[in-house]
Amino acid sequence: MNTSLLYAAMTVALAFGALSHAQDINQNHSTQSEVAHMTNQAFFEKLFGKWEGICRTWFEPGKLADESNVTGEFVNVLGGRFIRHAYEGAMQGKPRRGEELIGFNSITKLFQVTWVDEFHMNYAIMFSQGEPTPRGFKVRGDYDVGKDQPKWGWRTEYDLIDDDHLTITAFNILPTGEEAKAVETIYQRAK
């Protein structure tokens, strides 16, 4: 057998073996993914609906800058693959609105969030991602504080205490790594 035919035969055999192995892995991964997806779906379903509560904001560690009423609603997007959280409140007496689009990446097993907010994000969109927690998830993103300045980090934790109580807490992360509570939303299901 000539060398190029032998090489071609070996390549086909290796490719077929790799494909077969990949199909086995994909079948196994698909089962694991379905379990994670169901868990994700169940979590999203518990969030659906209208919520109300208070939102606290800190601009300096330990120094409360604002405490205002907030209302929010979680709705499913694209048949429940994603969930949208839209909220309205006030910041130091001025109206404030924002939205998050939340998803669970079945490949990376990470929650992913995009966030826009009239006050906190100005005209930017923050992308965050992170791991599930026993009662929700925690994600981390970065945002710009000024031209030619190092980005600051932002960590958000969703904690679904029970079917009627949800706390969303966000922390500023300085470029040096120190963290400080920035925003805390304490929701209860609207009646």
Regions found by a protein language model. Name each.
Residues M1-L5:
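Positively charged n-region of N-terminal signal peptides that target proteins for export
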Residues Y7-G17:
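Bacterial N-terminal signal peptides
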Residues A22-K191:
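Hydrophobic small-molecule pocket/channel-lining residues, especially in calycin-type beta-barrels
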